[in-house]
Each structure stands twice: as structure tokens, then as C-alpha cells.
Amino acid sequence: GDFTWNSLSGRSVRLAPVDIQSLSELERARLQEVAFTRLHQDYDLGCQITMPK
């Protein structure tokens, strides 16, 4: 799919698929936070989810 965002000022950002192993530690941590938040907001799993330490 096309993962491109365009701003009103004409700037654009395009996301490309990458292997998760190639992400930096900071990128992995942020991805984990986003996934955790989405699980809580979008799904009623009926169980407690905790972030690994």
C-alpha cells in the first residue's frame, strides 16, 4: 500500500516497509508503545496486557 502523508505546505513523508530487526532500539521502543496503545484503544481482549521489561 501507499503510506505517504502530505501536508498543506507541500511536504510529504513516505513510509517504506523494513525488517523489524533493522530498527534501532529507540524505534523498537516507540513501535512497542504505539502497538500497546492501539491494543488498549481498539480491542477489548478481556485480559491484562503488560509491557515486557
Swiss-Prot record:
Keyword match Cytoplasm: yes
GO molecular function: GTPase activator activity
Compartments in which it is found: Cytoplasm
A cellular component annotation (GO) from this entry: cytoplasm
Principal cellular location given in the protein's record: cytoplasm
Keywords from the UniProt entry: Cytoplasm, GTPase activation
Entry keyword annotation includes Lipoprotein: no
Function recorded in the entry: GTPase activator for the Rho-type GTPases by converting them to an inactive GDP-bound state. Could regulate the interactions of signaling molecules with the actin cytoskeleton. Promotes continuous elongation of cytoplasmic processes during cell motility and simultaneous retraction of the cell body changing the cell morphology.
Name of the protein in question: Rho GTPase-activating protein 6
Organism: Takifugu rubripes
Lineage of source species: Eukaryota, Metazoa, Chordata, Craniata, Vertebrata
Name of the gene this protein is made from: arhgap6
